[in-house]
Structures are given as structure tokens and as C-alpha cells.
Amino acid sequence: MKMKLTLDGIKDKKSWEAAGVVLPSYDIEKVKEETKKSPAWVHFGIGNIFRIFIGGIADTLISNGAMDKGITCVETFDFDVVDKIYAPYDNLVLGVTLKADGSTDKKVIASLTEAIKAQSNVEAEWNRLKEIFQNKDRAR
């Protein structure tokens, strides 16, 4: 069984469940679309702790129906994070939590809906960032 951490890859639910990985219970594409249209949560600095901790909190809130939008992720320093960690995996995260008894909880976190480089010399990235903060429909 070959599993891929991508939006297409997680459609093979049986393989992921057999591996003990919990998949998002919500419509990922709908959350991505709503977030892109009207961003509500923008986070600067998108490293490991952010992905599992803050991303995990947002994922739980979306799963519970307390939020209908994900997080717009902005990297200000190490742009390879976007290119090598976010983009190849469709912004999905495999969260593994080690518990005190040595067991693990594994889940796919899909709340990180867009990853942007705060790179002013790359017109598309910079324009998207400006668009987010100029969006009058953006939740306040």
C-alpha cells in the first residue's frame, strides 16, 4: 500500500484508516475556497510548531463546526518551507502526537489552506498578500 499525503492521496481512505491515521471529517475543498475568498486568520511564521499546534487547533475548530475557514500561512524568512513542505503535499500535514504511555495519535491536518511567501520581489506572491489585507470581506 502506497499512501501519498496529497488531496488525491487521502481519497484512499481505507489505506489511511488501516494505518491508524484519522482523516479530516470536513470538506477540505470548501474550506480552502471559503478561506481564499474571504481570509479570516493569517499567520506569519509557518514552521513545525505552528503546523502541529496552531494548525491542529484550527483543524479541531473546523471539525467541530466552530470555524468554516482555515489559516492563510505566510512565510517571511525561509521560503523553501513553502516550496518543499507545503506545496508538494497540498498544504496537508501529518500530525503525530506521542502520548505519555508511548502510544501515538496520527491525523491529517487540512486547516492550512494557503501558503504564501512574503517575498516582495515575486509579484504574484506579494500581490496575493496585499489582496488579502485589502479584502473588504475579510473577517475582522
Describe every region a protein language model picked out:
Residues 1-140:
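Non-transmembrane, aqueous-exposed alpha-helical and coiled segments at domain scale
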